[in-house]
Amino acid sequence: MKKLLLIAATSATILSSSVSFAEGMDHEWYLRIDTGAAMFNEEKDKATGVKLKSNTTVPVALGIGYYISENFRADLTLGTIIGGKLKKSGAATNAPFTRTNVSASHKPTITRLLINGYVDLTNFDMFDVFAGAGVGPALVKEKITYNGITGLSSNTKNRTNISYKLTLGTSAQIVDGVKVELAYSWIDDGRTKSKNVIYQGTSVPTGGMHYQSHNLTAGIRFDI
Protein backbone atom coordinates (compact mmCIF):
# COMPACT_ATOMS: atom_id res chain seq x y z
CA MET A 1 0.00 0.00 0.00
CA LYS A 2 2.86 2.39 0.84
CA LYS A 3 4.42 1.74 -2.55
CA LEU A 4 1.13 2.48 -4.32
CA LEU A 5 0.84 5.74 -2.39
CA LEU A 6 4.41 6.61 -3.33
CA ILE A 7 3.64 6.02 -7.00
CA ALA A 8 0.50 8.16 -6.72
CA ALA A 9 2.50 10.96 -5.09
CA THR A 10 5.15 10.71 -7.81
CA SER A 11 2.44 10.92 -10.45
CA ALA A 12 0.92 14.01 -8.85
CA THR A 13 4.32 15.71 -8.66
CA ILE A 14 5.11 14.99 -12.29
CA LEU A 15 1.71 16.21 -13.45
CA SER A 16 2.02 19.38 -11.37
CA SER A 17 5.43 20.11 -12.88
CA SER A 18 4.12 19.43 -16.37
CA VAL A 19 1.19 21.79 -15.88
CA SER A 20 3.48 24.58 -14.67
CA PHE A 21 5.77 24.05 -17.66
CA ALA A 22 2.95 23.97 -20.18
CA GLU A 23 0.99 26.96 -18.86
CA GLY A 24 3.43 29.34 -20.50
CA MET A 25 3.18 27.56 -23.83
CA ASP A 26 0.42 27.54 -26.42
CA HIS A 27 0.23 23.78 -26.91
CA GLU A 28 -2.62 21.33 -26.59
CA TRP A 29 -3.02 18.69 -23.94
CA TYR A 30 -4.47 15.28 -24.71
CA LEU A 31 -5.94 12.20 -23.07
CA ARG A 32 -5.07 8.74 -24.34
CA ILE A 33 -6.18 5.12 -24.01
CA ASP A 34 -4.36 2.09 -25.39
CA THR A 35 -5.05 -1.64 -25.53
CA GLY A 36 -4.01 -4.61 -27.61
CA ALA A 37 -2.17 -7.92 -27.29
CA ALA A 38 1.14 -8.86 -25.69
CA MET A 39 3.33 -11.90 -25.10
CA PHE A 40 6.10 -12.40 -22.55
CA ASN A 41 9.55 -13.75 -23.31
CA GLU A 42 10.07 -17.40 -22.42
CA GLU A 43 11.39 -18.06 -18.91
CA LYS A 44 12.52 -21.13 -16.96
CA ASP A 45 10.72 -22.14 -13.76
CA LYS A 46 13.28 -22.04 -10.95
CA ALA A 47 11.87 -24.93 -8.95
CA THR A 48 11.39 -27.51 -11.71
CA GLY A 49 13.49 -26.29 -14.63
CA VAL A 50 10.47 -26.44 -16.96
CA LYS A 51 10.71 -23.83 -19.74
CA LEU A 52 7.60 -21.64 -19.60
CA LYS A 53 5.80 -20.09 -22.54
CA SER A 54 3.45 -17.11 -22.61
CA ASN A 55 -0.20 -16.96 -23.46
CA THR A 56 -1.60 -13.83 -25.10
CA THR A 57 -2.28 -11.11 -22.55
CA VAL A 58 -4.15 -7.82 -22.88
CA PRO A 59 -2.24 -4.63 -21.97
CA VAL A 60 -4.33 -1.58 -21.00
CA ALA A 61 -3.09 1.96 -20.35
CA LEU A 62 -4.61 5.38 -19.65
CA GLY A 63 -2.69 8.62 -19.79
CA ILE A 64 -2.45 12.37 -20.10
CA GLY A 65 0.09 14.25 -22.21
CA TYR A 66 0.89 17.43 -24.10
CA TYR A 67 2.45 18.46 -27.39
CA ILE A 68 5.78 20.14 -26.69
CA SER A 69 6.31 20.99 -30.35
CA GLU A 70 4.92 20.02 -33.74
CA ASN A 71 6.92 16.78 -33.82
CA PHE A 72 7.46 16.00 -30.15
CA ARG A 73 5.08 15.06 -27.35
CA ALA A 74 5.29 13.61 -23.85
CA ASP A 75 2.79 11.83 -21.64
CA LEU A 76 2.29 10.06 -18.33
CA THR A 77 0.55 6.67 -18.50
CA LEU A 78 -0.76 4.21 -15.93
CA GLY A 79 -0.91 0.68 -17.30
CA THR A 80 -1.58 -2.92 -16.34
CA ILE A 81 -2.14 -6.32 -17.96
CA ILE A 82 -5.18 -8.60 -18.07
CA GLY A 83 -4.91 -12.38 -18.18
CA GLY A 84 -1.13 -12.74 -18.56
CA LYS A 85 0.49 -16.07 -17.74
CA LEU A 86 3.68 -18.07 -18.23
CA LYS A 87 2.94 -21.81 -18.19
CA LYS A 88 4.08 -25.20 -19.47
CA SER A 89 3.69 -28.90 -18.77
CA GLY A 90 6.63 -31.28 -18.94
CA ALA A 91 9.21 -33.34 -17.09
CA ALA A 92 11.06 -31.50 -14.34
CA THR A 93 14.85 -31.30 -14.69
CA ASN A 94 15.74 -29.84 -11.28
CA ALA A 95 16.20 -31.90 -8.09
CA PRO A 96 14.29 -33.00 -6.08
CA PHE A 97 11.66 -33.18 -8.85
CA THR A 98 13.78 -34.66 -11.65
CA ARG A 99 11.65 -36.53 -14.23
CA THR A 100 8.43 -35.71 -12.40
CA ASN A 101 5.66 -34.75 -14.82
CA VAL A 102 4.51 -31.32 -13.73
CA SER A 103 2.47 -28.37 -14.96
CA ALA A 104 3.88 -25.01 -13.83
CA SER A 105 2.06 -21.68 -14.06
CA HIS A 106 3.19 -18.14 -13.19
CA LYS A 107 0.43 -15.50 -13.25
CA PRO A 108 1.85 -11.97 -12.87
CA THR A 109 0.18 -8.81 -11.64
CA ILE A 110 1.91 -5.77 -13.13
CA THR A 111 1.09 -2.09 -12.60
CA ARG A 112 3.39 0.47 -14.21
CA LEU A 113 3.55 4.28 -14.24
CA LEU A 114 5.61 5.54 -17.18
CA ILE A 115 6.86 8.91 -18.35
CA ASN A 116 7.02 8.67 -22.16
CA GLY A 117 8.48 10.84 -24.89
CA TYR A 118 7.75 10.52 -28.63
CA VAL A 119 9.22 12.11 -31.74
CA ASP A 120 7.71 12.02 -35.24
CA LEU A 121 10.29 10.57 -37.63
CA THR A 122 8.38 11.29 -40.82
CA ASN A 123 5.24 13.25 -41.67
CA PHE A 124 3.06 12.11 -44.56
CA ASP A 125 -0.24 13.54 -45.75
CA MET A 126 -2.26 10.68 -44.25
CA PHE A 127 -0.13 9.50 -41.30
CA ASP A 128 3.01 10.01 -39.19
CA VAL A 129 5.68 7.51 -38.14
CA PHE A 130 7.04 7.97 -34.61
CA ALA A 131 9.48 6.46 -32.13
CA GLY A 132 9.36 6.74 -28.37
CA ALA A 133 10.75 5.62 -25.04
CA GLY A 134 9.42 5.49 -21.50
CA VAL A 135 10.63 4.82 -17.98
CA GLY A 136 9.03 4.64 -14.55
CA PRO A 137 8.19 2.50 -11.51
CA ALA A 138 6.39 -0.83 -11.79
CA LEU A 139 4.80 -3.00 -9.09
CA VAL A 140 5.31 -6.67 -9.97
CA LYS A 141 4.15 -9.83 -8.19
CA GLU A 142 3.02 -13.30 -9.24
CA LYS A 143 0.91 -16.29 -8.28
CA ILE A 144 2.76 -19.58 -8.78
CA THR A 145 0.90 -22.89 -9.05
CA TYR A 146 1.99 -26.46 -9.76
CA ASN A 147 -0.02 -29.51 -10.77
CA GLY A 148 1.79 -32.77 -10.13
CA ILE A 149 3.68 -31.50 -7.08
CA THR A 150 1.79 -30.94 -3.82
CA GLY A 151 2.71 -28.14 -1.42
CA LEU A 152 4.93 -26.08 -3.72
CA SER A 153 2.48 -23.42 -4.95
CA SER A 154 3.04 -19.92 -3.55
CA ASN A 155 2.51 -16.19 -4.04
CA THR A 156 5.23 -13.53 -4.14
CA LYS A 157 4.81 -10.06 -2.63
CA ASN A 158 4.95 -6.85 -4.64
CA ARG A 159 8.36 -5.73 -5.79
CA THR A 160 9.02 -2.20 -7.06
CA ASN A 161 11.13 -2.24 -10.23
CA ILE A 162 12.14 0.30 -12.85
CA SER A 163 10.19 -0.40 -16.04
CA TYR A 164 11.53 0.49 -19.49
CA LYS A 165 9.64 0.85 -22.75
CA LEU A 166 10.69 1.31 -26.39
CA THR A 167 8.07 2.08 -29.04
CA LEU A 168 7.77 2.35 -32.82
CA GLY A 169 4.43 3.23 -34.37
CA THR A 170 2.26 5.19 -36.72
CA SER A 171 -0.55 7.67 -36.09
CA ALA A 172 -3.25 9.33 -38.16
CA GLN A 173 -5.81 12.06 -37.53
CA ILE A 174 -9.39 10.86 -38.08
CA VAL A 175 -11.18 14.11 -37.13
CA ASP A 176 -10.06 17.42 -35.65
CA GLY A 177 -8.58 16.80 -32.21
CA VAL A 178 -8.65 13.00 -32.44
CA LYS A 179 -5.77 10.76 -33.54
CA VAL A 180 -5.43 6.99 -33.66
CA GLU A 181 -2.23 4.99 -33.21
CA LEU A 182 -0.91 1.54 -34.04
CA ALA A 183 2.34 0.72 -32.26
CA TYR A 184 4.79 -2.02 -31.32
CA SER A 185 6.43 -1.75 -27.90
CA TRP A 186 9.02 -3.75 -26.00
CA ILE A 187 8.61 -3.46 -22.23
CA ASP A 188 10.91 -4.70 -19.46
CA ASP A 189 9.15 -4.77 -16.07
CA GLY A 190 12.00 -6.49 -14.20
CA ARG A 191 11.91 -9.54 -11.94
CA THR A 192 9.49 -10.65 -9.25
CA LYS A 193 10.73 -11.45 -5.77
CA SER A 194 12.33 -14.86 -5.21
CA LYS A 195 10.90 -17.06 -2.49
CA ASN A 196 12.13 -20.29 -0.90
CA VAL A 197 9.47 -22.91 -0.15
CA ILE A 198 10.21 -25.84 2.16
CA TYR A 199 9.30 -29.06 0.35
CA GLN A 200 9.77 -32.31 2.29
CA GLY A 201 12.58 -30.74 4.29
CA THR A 202 14.32 -29.20 1.26
CA SER A 203 14.43 -25.46 0.54
CA VAL A 204 13.21 -24.96 -3.04
CA PRO A 205 13.59 -21.58 -4.83
CA THR A 206 10.51 -20.21 -6.58
CA GLY A 207 9.55 -16.90 -8.20
CA GLY A 208 12.15 -14.56 -9.66
CA MET A 209 10.58 -14.46 -13.12
CA HIS A 210 11.85 -11.73 -15.46
CA TYR A 211 8.86 -10.18 -17.22
CA GLN A 212 9.72 -8.74 -20.63
CA SER A 213 6.97 -8.40 -23.21
CA HIS A 214 6.33 -7.67 -26.87
CA ASN A 215 3.21 -5.52 -27.27
CA LEU A 216 1.07 -4.65 -30.29
CA THR A 217 -1.42 -1.95 -29.34
CA ALA A 218 -4.01 0.37 -30.80
CA GLY A 219 -4.59 3.71 -29.15
CA ILE A 220 -6.57 6.89 -29.44
CA ARG A 221 -5.65 10.45 -28.40
CA PHE A 222 -8.21 13.18 -27.65
CA ASP A 223 -7.10 16.81 -27.53
CA ILE A 224 -8.42 18.66 -24.46
Curated annotation (Swiss-Prot):
This is Putative adhesin A1G_07050. The keyword Signal applies. Residues 1-22 form the signal peptide. It comes from the Bacteria. SUPFAM superfamilies: OMPA-like. InterPro entries: OMP/PagP_b-brl, OMP_b-brl. Keywords: Signal.
